[in-house]
């Protein structure tokens, strides 16, 4: 009987139990810093790993389009009390080892949402699609809760429920206000107002004649469509960075240029 070759044996013969050479997977990767646009702080708020450029593959192109999520406490100074606010950013450009991002949405933590929901009050939810003056189409979700009037506090009842007609009127007021504000502003200024308390205070003032509200919150923001950002627009979003402050890649050169030089050889 002809004995066949064992495909598991190497040509030169191998010793049983020989150790394989281990390669550190991190040696093939490099770190990139996340940078946030206006209205957030210009400092780095996180890092990500990317496989190094090789062949026709450029690492800086692979990282573009990634969506990252952070809290407002990490993105903005003196905002530790807003750690419940989550911010989504998408990477649009890579400058050296800096991954520059732009606004991509808002959300709140689950524990914050649960802490606002209580008994004996009406929860009002509003949703509207609006367009900023620089071409962003976004969907804004707003939460509001009714509160007792001065007359209700003096009465024995513990509830402060709104009628369905009042809920509809409040919802219309909120949606109209958000739509009008978005049409007047660009995404940088509009996102700044959504994160702050300017809009919630104005909504409370405009709806107090219908029914008093409390705990008005921009619960979520989704970016449905955004324009293509060119170099000029990205420079405007990062005008808060100091001039001349630019991270460098390997050997003091931007990573994209080093990869292109490698391909040209």
Swiss-Prot record:
InterPro entries: Ribosomal_eS1 (IPR001593), Ribosomal_eS1_CS (IPR018281), Ribosomal_eS1_euk (IPR027500). It is found in: Cytoplasm. Keywords: Cytoplasm, Ribonucleoprotein, Ribosomal protein. GO terms for biological process: translation. It comes from the Eukaryota. Its main location: cytoplasm. Residues 1-24, 240-265 are annotated as: Disordered. One of its GO terms (molecular function) is structural constituent of ribosome. Residues 240-253 have a biased composition (Basic and acidic residues). One of its GO terms (cellular component) is cytosolic small ribosomal subunit. PANTHER family: 40S RIBOSOMAL PROTEIN S3A (PTHR11830). Belongs to the eukaryotic ribosomal protein eS1 family. Component of the small ribosomal subunit. Mature ribosomes consist of a small (40S) and a large (60S) subunit. The 40S subunit contains about 33 different proteins and 1 molecule of RNA (18S). The 60S subunit contains about 49 different proteins and 3 molecules of RNA (25S, 5.8S and 5S). This is Small ribosomal subunit protein eS1.
């Amino acid at each position: 009987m002809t004995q066949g070759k064992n495909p598991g044996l190497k040509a030169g013969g191998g010793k049983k139990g020989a150790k394989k050479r281990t390669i550190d997977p991190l040696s093939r990767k490099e770190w990139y810093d996340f940078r946030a646009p206006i209205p957030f702080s210009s400092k780095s708020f996180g890092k990500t790993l990317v496989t190094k450029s090789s062949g026709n593959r450029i690492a800086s192109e692979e990282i573009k389009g990634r969506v990252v999520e952070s809290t407002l406490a990490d993105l903005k100074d003196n905002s530790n009390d807003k750690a419940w606010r989550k911010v989504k950013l998408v990477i649009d450009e890579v400058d050296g080892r800096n991954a520059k991002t732009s606004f991509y949405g808002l959300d709140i933590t689950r524990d914050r949402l649960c802490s606002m929901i209580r008994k004996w009050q009406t929860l009002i939810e509003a949703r509207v699609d609006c367009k900023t003056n620089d071409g962003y189409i976004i969907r804004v979700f707003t939460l509001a809760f009714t509160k007792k009037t001065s007359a209700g506090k003096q009465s024995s009842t513990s509830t402060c429920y709104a009628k369905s007609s009042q809920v509809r009127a409040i919802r219309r007021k909120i949606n109209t206000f958000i739509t009008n504000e978005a049409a007047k502003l660009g995404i940088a200024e509009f996102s700044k107002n959504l994160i702050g308390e300017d809009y919630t205070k104005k909504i409370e003032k405009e709806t107090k004649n219908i029914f008093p509200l409390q705990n008005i919150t921009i619960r979520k923001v989704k970016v449905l469509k955004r324009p293509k950002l060119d170099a000029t627009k990205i420079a405007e979003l990062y005008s808060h960075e100091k001039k001349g402050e630019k991270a460098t890649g390997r050997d003091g050169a931007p990573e994209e240029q080093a990869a292109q030089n490698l391909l040209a050889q």
